């Protein structure tokens, strides 16, 4: 390709990327493969804003299925935008700000997608573990990133049966609190 920068600028423009600050240039024309080049230098954008920007309010944005054949949930762009805005507002009201970590101990559901997009919308770092992780595995992940908020499910559908998830969640929270209350080796 002779004009790499022009090509990628055309892709950016054609895709309608929403950015609060435009890039000074897409990429240097003669950028080497290694070390990797800087792309779209100076651009500032939000992933969630770009995901939610497209689609008419009445169009289906998400089709979520479970292992039950008759359990399919459809969510429109309008509903998704509204739910993400509400969840984002709730996160902000809890003091979540850019750079804070928000976690999920839940499955791949529409509700979890809403939580992820809301966290992204406020600029938070997102991490998640599936509900089949045991408490030790969740604590190993979460104590490293120290989430300020954890989204979780209260029950899990597995092999046709609903399983309570609250016990594992409570054990995780207790383990995190024990880890997070430790502040110093200094004596009082």
Region annotations inferred by a language model:
Residues 20-42, 108:
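Active-site diphosphate/adenylate-binding microenvironment
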Residues 65, 153, 184:
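Conserved residues at the C-terminal ends of beta-strands
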Residues 106, 128, 149:
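Phosphate-binding active sites in nucleotide-utilizing proteins
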Residues 62-117, 134-139:
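Conserved AMP-binding/adenylate-forming core of the ANL superfamily
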Residues 182-188:
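Conserved small/polar residues in nucleotide/adenosyl-binding loops
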Residues 116, 133-176:
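Conserved ATP-dependent adenylate/AMP-binding module captured primarily in the ANL superfamily
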Residues 6-22, 41-63:
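A short N-terminal helical cap/helix-turn-helix that marks the beginning
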Residues 123:
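Structured binding elements
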